[in-house]
């Protein structure tokens, strides 16, 4: 079993902000699979089980994401953990993968590292840097960024579909890494 976590903040206030990239990508995946999330009070998270994957959206707010991840890990005992998250150190249009390592100052990852460890896979979605970190990550994408954001989120969703079928992180990494921003046609 694999735990697949999309990071974000609950409530409409934060819907579709840069920091909610993980939520948005998982929502798109679940919708395409014709499934739905169910709220679990036990884990304070929205859950969806598909094949041998548990898809999770913590409802704790970003800085406490580790609480939901730990609770779910302890209950389901997954062999693998993959976190989908925004990364302001990467330009919009870039998708990278990582196995373990530091949290890069991402508070959701800090919480997971503190409570669970940092031994997990990551799907990092670039959101670019802006002036004022908090204001930037909690802002929505600009209208001129929407086409690129949509293409990148679709690319990330396809990477997750590949991973669900293959169970092969390295193959997903080799096939779906975007070191340079994705080119889209106007």
Swiss-Prot record:
PROSITE patterns membership: PEPT_TRNA_HYDROL_1, PEPT_TRNA_HYDROL_2
Q: Gene3D superfamilies from the entry?
A: Peptidyl-tRNA hydrolase (3.40.50.1470)
Picking any one GO biological process from the record gives: rescue of stalled ribosome
Query: Site annotated as Discriminates between blocked and unblocked aminoacyl-tRNA: where?
Result: 9
Instruction: Report keywords, A-Z.
Output: Cytoplasm, Hydrolase, RNA-binding, tRNA-binding
Task: Cite the record's note on assembly.
Answer: Monomer.
This protein's name: Peptidyl-tRNA hydrolase
